[in-house]
Amino acid sequence: MEARLTKEEVEVLHEQADRTFFHTHFKFLRSHKGFRPKNIHMVLGTSHGGKSTLIRSLLTDICTGAVKQNVLLWLSEETELEFLSEFYRSGINPDNVKNLHVLSELDLMERYKTPKNLLRYIEMYCGENDIGLLFFDNITTSMIYMGRSPSDQAKISIDLKKMCQLLALPFIIIAHTGAAVTDSSNRLIEMNDIRGGKSIVNLAQFFYVLQTFHCDSEIYTTIRITKHRGQEVDHRFYRLIYSRKERLYGRDELVQFKEFKEIYKRRNVL
């Protein structure tokens, strides 16, 4: 195939790159104009490191936004009821949740016993329900991925990217670090600390590392943008501010690199 685009096609690509498709109040997402259609956005963090809290925070942000989008949350570790029980504890108005769809592998595994069948069902569900954003919590504990060989995980990763392209939506995938990696490790968590195969890391266009530091009695939950394909990013370090009342990250704030280094130096180390 001839690798050439017309002038008009190039202009369309440039217009899309400059456009914000999904508005958000989170600054770390606004730094690259929000979630991008046809792009995989990976969030990596330790077990009990705040990933599910971040997902609930992002979903609340989307559900309460001015522009209503149909959103699908695909779960691997919780049932639909378990998720919703925690989600509603934030006090969100049920009227704002009408566009949220939740599917759990724990509820579906008897009907869809193979990765191929489950992926086909997720793809069909997105199409039939006009889903605009897809969240997957958590790939590394999913029946389609966990315990499979590196080659099988690589194939699944490619299938997920193909589905993202076909549905033309942002695909937000949550992943665990390996068991030996903790928030109090003597280094920063990196993309390749993901549990299992690394293929999905290479295929993702955007990558965020969630890491919490304890400095004496203070807690700093940080999110770092480590990959941002096709978008310029001026700032890569942010702190997530937790609201005990809502049990969510209510907002985030920019952290300068110098400040981030100081937080890292002051962290409690076991």
Where on the chain are the PLM-derived regions?
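Short hydrophobic alpha-helical runs that function as membrane-insertion/retention elements
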Residues: 70-72, 172, 208-210
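Flexible loop residues that form catalytic
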Residues: 139, 177, 212
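Walker A/P-loop NTP-binding active-site region of P-loop NTPases
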Residues: 29-94, 203-205
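C-terminal regions of RecA-like/P-loop NTPase motor modules
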Residues: 1-28, 41, 47-52, 63, ...
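Short, active-site-adjacent cap segments at secondary-structure transitions
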Residues: 141-143, 178-182
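Structural recognition of the conserved hydrophobic beta-strand(s) that form the central parallel beta-sheet
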Residues: 73-74, 135-136, 169-177
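Charged helix-capping and loop-helix junction motifs
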Residues: 150-159, 190-194
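Conserved inter-motif catalytic segment of the P-loop NTP-binding fold
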Residues: 7-10, 24, 46, 66-151, ...
